[in-house]
Swiss-Prot record:
The chain crosses the membrane at residues 12-32, 42-62, 70-90, 96-116, 137-157. It comes from Pseudomonas putida (strain ATCC 47054 / DSM 6125 / CFBP 8728 / NCIMB 11950 / KT2440). The keyword Cell membrane applies. This is Lipoprotein signal peptidase. It catalyses: Release of signal peptides from bacterial membrane prolipoproteins. Hydrolyzes -Xaa-Yaa-Zaa-|-(S,diacylglyceryl)Cys-, in which Xaa is hydrophobic (preferably Leu), and Yaa (Ala or Ser) and Zaa (Gly or Ala) have small, neutral side chains. One of its GO terms (molecular function) is aspartic-type endopeptidase activity. It is found in: Cell inner membrane. InterPro entries: Peptidase_A8. Signal peptide: none annotated.
Amino acid sequence: MPNPAAGRFGRLAWLWLSLLVLVIDQATKLYFNNALTMYQQIVVIPDYFSWTLAYNTGAAFSFLADGAGWQRWLFALIAVVVSAVLVVWLKRLGRNETWLAVALALVLGGAIGNLYDRIVLGHVVDFILVHWQNRHYFPAFNVADSAITVGAVMLALDMFKSKKSEDPVHD
């Protein structure tokens, strides 16, 4: 049921943030795809942070990357469905739900950025590499992944905040 306090378009104005995430994501992927060769590393902060180029045909942490290609379309379908749900959710938000609107817009922008890669390129371009002393590496990721993660953390925090505010006060 639509939220009457949302107005006609709800919080769809926050789609500018999704577009900004998408543009920055695609611009950085294009830059690193052209500037680096596969798995080349440029150390930015020794022992902690590097630029690299990696292609991920799977999902997070290369989940199902060894599939025969069907996973590309499965993850694309999931991204399309999730994106549609996020737009509807964003539209139904009230004016006072800015935190949630930002969270949804970040997740949406990231999902569309990776969806574009998956459909057009057949893989997601990753280029950010965080590591500890060249021994312990976190899987490479990109701006879209970062936006999705920040948005998901914001959603979780919002759920905890909402749940806490609904708890009855005990004397």
